[in-house]
């Protein structure tokens, strides 16, 4: 299940763990990424809390926790190569994995069609 937020994050659910990243739209708006800061594994995040930072030559932008849960993994490759996040934001450029407190909360997020309309 793939879902999107109005803060331009995407989530892909596998069991009760969601992989989180920025959308292609967000990556395009930011331009070339030069720095990525990710949350620490084991940290509990609350929906809406700043979880990560992506910085481009244009601007720095917070990435908010789309749902509440515990960080189980971070994309180390994104730390060493921030450009990979912009090059493949919804694939190899994922940011972190979040074990969700409530999987059913995914239902409140936008599906791909709704996000495409939102991002126009």
From Swiss-Prot:
Its cofactor is (R)-lipoate. The keyword Amino-acid biosynthesis does not apply. This is Glycine cleavage system H protein. Coiled coil: none annotated. The glycine cleavage system catalyzes the degradation of glycine. The H protein shuttles the methylamine group of glycine from the P protein to the T protein. Residues 17-99 form the Lipoyl-binding domain. GO terms for biological process: glycine decarboxylation via glycine cleavage system. Pfam families: GCV_H. Binds 1 lipoyl cofactor covalently. Keywords: Lipoyl. InterPro entries: 2-oxoA_DH_lipoyl-BS, Biotin_lipoyl, GCV_H, GCV_H/Fam206, GCV_H_sub, Single_hybrid_motif. The glycine cleavage system is composed of four proteins: P, T, L and H. The modification N6-lipoyllysine is found at residue 58. One of its GO terms (cellular component) is cytoplasm. Belongs to the GcvH family.
């Amino acid at each position: 299940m793939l879902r999107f937020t109005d803060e331009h994050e995407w989530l892909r659910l596998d069991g009760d763990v969601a992989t989180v990243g920025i959308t292609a739209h967000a990556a395009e708006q930011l331009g070339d990424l030069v720095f990525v800061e990710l949350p620490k594994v084991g940290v509990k995040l609350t929906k809406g809390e700043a979880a990560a930072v992506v910085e481009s030559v244009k601007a720095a932008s917070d990435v908010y926790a789309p749902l509440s849960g515990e960080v189980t993994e971070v994309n180390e490759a994104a730390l060493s190569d921030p450009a990979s996040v912009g090059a493949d934001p919804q694939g190899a450029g994922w940011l972190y994995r979040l074990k969700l407190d409530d999987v059913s909360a995914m239902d409140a997020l936008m599906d791909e069609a709704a996000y495409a309309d939102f991002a126009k």
